Amino acid sequence: MIDHIGVSVSDFERSVEFYKKALAPLGYELIKSFAGVAAGFGVAPKPDFWIGKGDVKQHVHVAIRASGRAQVRAFYEAAIAAGGKDNGAPGVRPHYHEHYYGAFVTDPDGHNIEAVCHEPFLG
């Protein structure tokens, strides 16, 4: 089981503000910050998604599980409003499996951030 992940960002403050807004609909909040160097987000009390000031040498793809399709849509809307770029609007992705519902947004550094729900739509 993965405990946490870290992602390099070129502009730390800009990325903190982006992730505070983009991840809020998923229940994530800024839990820990180290003076302009690193910040940890997650569902309290434990951060599991970290960003750190550094060179962005390659882009990563991170998927965060959502509790339902509405939460996926809320993530997408919040991330776009926070300055993210569309990389796949909310929708079913049957090539993964019949209930895979995800949305993809690139952050200010081009990292592909996804919210995903694996549950069938119940109406």
Regions found by a protein language model. Name each.
Residues D11-E13, A63-P108:
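Vicinal oxygen chelate
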Residues H97-E98, F104, A115-L122:
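Short beta->alpha transition motifs characteristic of CBS
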Residues N112:
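Glycine-rich acetyl-CoA-binding "A-motif" of GNAT/NAT acetyltransferases
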